[in-house]
Regions:
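Surface-exposed interfaces of beta-sheet-rich extracellular modules
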Residues: 1-3, 43-46, 84-90, 124-158
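Short, compositionally stereotyped local motifs that mark structural "simplifiers"
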Residues: 1-104, 110-111, 160
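Conserved "repeat-terminator" motif of extracellular CCP/Sushi domains
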Residues: 14-15, 97-107, 133, 152-173
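Extracellular modular ligand-binding repeats in secreted and cell-surface proteins
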Residues: 29, 35, 69-73, 109-141, ...
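Residue-level detector of conserved, well-ordered beta-strand and adjacent loop positions
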Residues: 38, 49-51, 56, 107, ...
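Flexible, glycine-rich phosphate/dinucleotide-binding loops
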Residues: 55, 113, 149-152
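Short acidic, glycine/proline-rich loop/turn micro-motifs
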Residues: 58-63, 116-117, 154
Length: 173
């Protein structure tokens, strides 16, 4: 937005206020980041980029912000706020750190079917994937870090924080 306002012919409007610089916040969601952007300027429209480039004056390089979005680790989010009767804000920037990820390997432990490995960011509470194994004449009772059930037990879809790669074995009764 150029900030131009309608004035009487022959007069020049002076812009005295600048839109508030956007605030970029990010939280880890799975193995990515969930990004939210806000501006304290009422009615401001926010444009952003995720490749580190500047959301330029014509906004041809920016995407209009309409709500939270997901971004891969290692990216840089930049944003600018624009509003009628205001000068454009300065550009905000947030570098999203690379995440250490760990994997859960699922073993059927006598059951049938398959499950893909599940990736989780280090130290982030994430639900274990829902069991997809089956075993004729048996009921799935949860997961365990040992095939014999004498390790650490987890309920189906329980939230856990990983600090290393683990293998979970389906438990049956």
């Amino acid at each position: 937005d150029s900030g131009a306002t309608s004035t009487a012919p022959g007069t020049i409007a002076t812009i005295t206020q600048t839109a508030a610089k956007p605030v970029i916040s990010a939280s880890v969601s799975g193995t990515s980041y969930k990004v939210k952007i806000t501006s304290k300027t009422s009615g401001a429209v926010i444009y952003y980029t995720t490749d580190g480039s500047e959301p330029n004056a014509a906004y041809s390089k920016g995407t209009r912000y309409t709500g939270a979005f997901t971004v891969s680790p290692g990216k840089t989010v930049k944003a600018v706020a624009v509003c009628n009767k205001y000068a454009d804000s300065s550009v905000s920037s947030k570098k999203l750190a690379k995440l250490t990820t760990y994997k859960i390997t699922f073993k059927s432990n006598g059951g049938k079917g398959s499950m893909s490995k599940q990736s989780m960011a280090k130290g982030v509470s994430t639900a274990i994937s829902k069991n997809k194994f089956s075993r004729k004449y048996y009921t799935f009772t949860g997961w365990n870090t040992k095939a014999n059930g004498k390790g650490k037990s987890y309920k189906n879809k329980a939230k856990i924080k990983l600090t290393k790669n683990i293998t979970l074995y389906a438990q049956w009764k």
